[in-house]
Amino acid sequence: MAVNTYNLLRKQSSSIMMRLLVLVLLLLPISLFAQQKHALLVGISDYPQYKISDASWSRIHGANDVRLLSPILSKQGFKVETLTDKSATHKAIEKSLKKLSQTVHSGDMVYIHLSGHGQAVEDISGDEDDGWDEAFIPYDAQRLYQKDIYTGNNHLLDDELNQYLDAIRTKVGATGMVYVVIDACHAGSSYRGEEDTDSVYVRGTDIGFSQSGKTYAPKIDKRGNIRVTSRPDMAPLYMLEACRSYEVNTEIKQENLFYGPLSYYISQELLTSTLSTDTNWIENVRKKIDKDTRLIRQHMVTESSR
């Protein structure tokens, strides 16, 4: 009789525990199971000016891109972090990328946007076929190599960015998605226009950052889509770039404000399209850029893992 009573109590206890477990799971926030959306937006307009003018970057309007895109992405459910002007130092960008790689989870979506100047950097490691790395220019990166003054430590090299992207893609896994937008340029002339006119604002420089004094000659690659390496356990990667390596990225004026053309047309597309695993929106952006007669000399480039 005692044994039967004991067994009955065990069954009742197990049943109660199971019900409690189900109740706890039901009470857990739905967000723990849903895909999380993360966005890091970096945009620089006003770079520091140095005594040596060749070390300084011209004024552009990268911060406008961030202000344009931030509310749109927030409305789509993204947790948005922004870094603009003085806050967009190399250290700050690196810190945000590292944090992103540590906080994302399997199945998450990540959107990274970089708006500012770009520059080709002489490849010291020897991993680039053409002898040049590509770099995004944070707020505290100078344009000119100067021994014992500035040697490029604040340039955000493509090698460095790719390391963080690999970590993020591995963390979110094959069910996640990673988008990267680079509204910069590595072949511009950095012409400084007047704020109250329709003067040309160009992102980037045609002067390579070189320790040896090497002259930069951009590689002529007319491909519009480039395949990047991947692994089965990694999230798909789609990287959008404002122009080909030998072209100039010219800002456009809309409603009395200047924007990077890639950023502007992404914002217009995302007013009606929701970022997801469906990548049709990318080609819609390309078509919008191609239709703009102000941009006939630049062509959007995509790099993708599939």
Residue ranges of each PLM-predicted region?
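Sec-dependent N-terminal signal peptides
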Residues: 20-29
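Intrinsically disordered, low-complexity segments
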Residues: 11-13, 29, 74
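N-terminal secretory signal peptides that target proteins for export/translocation
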Residues: 1-18
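A composition/secondary-structure signal for short, hydrophobic, low-basic-content segments
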Residues: 8, 31-34
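Cysteine endopeptidase catalytic domains of the caspase/legumain-like
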Residues: 2, 23, 34-306
